[in-house]
């Protein structure tokens, strides 16, 4: 149900209808509240996006760092810096942290190579984090290929918690697999969207209407044998967002992660 609510809210927020919407929310006590959602034309705000819209960080206390990454897109270029460069700059600001909470809940993917550059900081040797089943070009032969993460840059010996949700897709799910399925991090929040497939796009025309057809080129499986498609990656610590959390602008996922760090990880 949380997944459906999140999807409905997302659809409202990106709607092309230039009007405000009023959402009625009922809490456990039966009280109802009206939430007004204002339409914003994304074309009006895109040119002014700052670095913080893509990557942001802060120290939550003297030991816990918080790193938010909203995309792995290779098209991001801020004064010559790509996403990986922005992440590296923010990691330097969190150098004193003993534990790191990585928030990728709003990240729908991009370039897995950029994701590998961050994940590679937290391993000391190559490690397999999943497999993909592909078809050889021009043949019916199916081939299993291991997905292997290589160490990248300086090793960062930090305890890791990753915040996940239904908007996590594609190469961002691969990033989560790199650290969760290799027992390098625990995840908190909601199950991811379950969408990879490494699709290829084809433009087709039906009469005067134009469509884009996306065709999957592989099937991805996690180290535990579970398929990723349409299933997603379940969190180690699931969290339910209540109507009261929405009304009061609370972040129960982050709260749970901080509680876990304080009570379970050596700081």
PLM region spans:
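Conserved PDZ fold ligand-binding element
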Residues: 1, 101-103, 179, 187-189, ...
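Gly/Ser/Thr-rich loop/hinge elements
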Residues: 109-163, 167, 197-207, 217-221, ...
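Soluble non-cytosolic domains of exported or imported proteins
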Residues: 3, 77-85, 109-116, 154, ...
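Flexible, low-complexity junctional segments that flank or bridge functional domains
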Residues: 1-99, 106-108, 120, 124, ...
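Extracytoplasmic/secreted envelope proteins and their assembly/folding machinery
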Residues: 84-91, 115-119, 157-160, 172-176, ...
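Short, well-structured beta-strand/strand-turn elements
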Residues: 100, 169, 182-196
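Extracytoplasmic
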Residues: 18-20, 32, 61-64, 95-99, ...
């Amino acid at each position: 149900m949380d997944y459906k609510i999140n999807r409905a809210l997302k659809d409202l927020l990106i709607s092309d209808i230039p009007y405000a919407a009023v959402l009625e929310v009922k809490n456990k006590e039966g009280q109802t509240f009206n939430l007004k959602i204002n339409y914003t034309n994304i074309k009006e705000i895109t040119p002014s996006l700052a670095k913080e819209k893509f990557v942001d960080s802060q120290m939550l206390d003297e030991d816990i760092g918080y790193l938010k990454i909203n995309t792995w897109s290779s098209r991001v270029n801020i004064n010559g810096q790509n996403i990986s460069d922005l992440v590296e700059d923010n990691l330097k600001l969190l150098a004193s942290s003993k534990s790191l909470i990585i928030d990728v809940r709003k990240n729908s993917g991009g370039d897995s190579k950029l994701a590998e550059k961050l994940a590679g900081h937290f391993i000391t040797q190559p490690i397999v984090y999943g497999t993909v089943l592909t078809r050889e070009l021009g043949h019916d032969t199916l081939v299993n290929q291991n997905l292997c993460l290589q160490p990248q840059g300086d090793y960062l010996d930090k305890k890791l918690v990753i915040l996940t949700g239904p908007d996590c897709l594609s190469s961002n799910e691969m990033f989560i697999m790199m650290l969760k399925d290799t027992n390098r991090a625990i995840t908190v929040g909601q199950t991811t969207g379950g969408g990879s497939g490494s699709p290829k796009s084809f433009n087709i025309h039906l009469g005067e209407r134009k469509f884009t057809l996306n065709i999957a080129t592989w099937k991805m499986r996690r180290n535990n044998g579970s398929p990723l498609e349409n299933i997603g990656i379940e969190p180690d610590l699931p969290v339910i967002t209540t109507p009261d959390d929405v009304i009061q602008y609370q972040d129960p996922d982050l709260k749970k992660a901080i509680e876990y760090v304080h009570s379970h990880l050596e700081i």
